[in-house]
Amino acid sequence: MAEQEQLGDVRLYRIPIEVTVAARSQKQVALLRQPAVRVENLLRLRIGPGDVDGPLQRLLVTRNRPAEGLGLALPAGKVATFAMRDGRRILIGEGRIDDHTIGEKVEITIGTATGVRARQRSVPGTTDAYDLTVTNDLAETQTVEVELPLDSWSLKGGKLVKREGWMLWRVNVPANGRRELRYRIKM
């Protein structure tokens, strides 16, 4: 594993073994191998007005701190996530992260969710009301976040909260179940 050093405000990662890199080439080495990092596994969808029918993105969310199994400055780059199934390590997904300092929130999009879909349709006879349905065909409850743009909207309905410029609907969708939200926009 690489060892972190600091030179002023620049972080260096020294590789503890000799490595040869040919001219105009690159070499990948593991920066970090953590057997257990505490993460929240959730699904997210960002939508605007109009019809939507499709899958959601699967994210892993954590804080970059020792209590969660991290706690070092993380440089931008690729991330691979694995899980143990029947005694074997299997790839769950791959994503990218930006630079993250210690204590910062880390979100990694690791792919498209299977078995969970969102469908939004305008309510017949209206121009400002929408029905949003999230269905879960999986055998486990899934935590879903739907983000609706806040800028020119006035949203009414459901349990919506403001977060980072978005209206957020966060819901647990039961196994083989669905959750619905009806909301209105005012432009």
Tell me what each language-model feature is.
Residues 1-187:
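Long, intrinsically disordered, low-complexity accessory segments associated with secretion
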